């Protein structure tokens, strides 16, 4: 029985599915973290020379099509990476089944709403300016 828990006996049971899901979650966290490093460096370098207190300067920066794409990619990646992290915290520290389910639903909803609002703002500024 202990061997099955560590995955030495693989007969296609539920354990195999759980292991694959855990591996995908682990890989997704690492990949999004690497992407965020590069996008974060791009963003920091891009706004370094800008007068970020001047509304017009920021609008012109966001209106560039490349910046619209990269800001949207940054937003989606950040929201997904954050969602993955919050999911781990909920799974590790919330033990009541109903609260766990409610927390997962609330987390997913909050992250999706954040991403939609941010993408809407980026695209709206990109189209108007």
Predicted regions and their residues:
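Membrane-embedded alpha-helical bundles that constitute the cytochrome b-like, heme-associated redox core
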Residues: 1-129
């Amino acid at each position: 029985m202990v061997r099955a828990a560590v995955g030495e006996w693989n007969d296609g049971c539920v354990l195999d599915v759980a292991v694959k899901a855990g591996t995908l979650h682990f890989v997704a966290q690492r990949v999004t973290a690497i992407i965020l490093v590069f996008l974060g460096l791009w963003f920091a370098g891009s706004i370094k020379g800008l007068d970020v207190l001047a509304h017009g300067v920021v609008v012109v920066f966001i209106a560039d099509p490349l910046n619209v794409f990269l800001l949207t990619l940054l937003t989606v990646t950040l929201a997904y990476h954050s969602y993955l992290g919050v999911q781990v915290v909920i799974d590790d520290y919330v033990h009541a089944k109903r609260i766990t389910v409610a927390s997962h639903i609330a987390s997913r909803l909050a992250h999706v709403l954040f991403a939609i609002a941010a993408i809407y703002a980026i695209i709206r500024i990109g189209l108007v300016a």
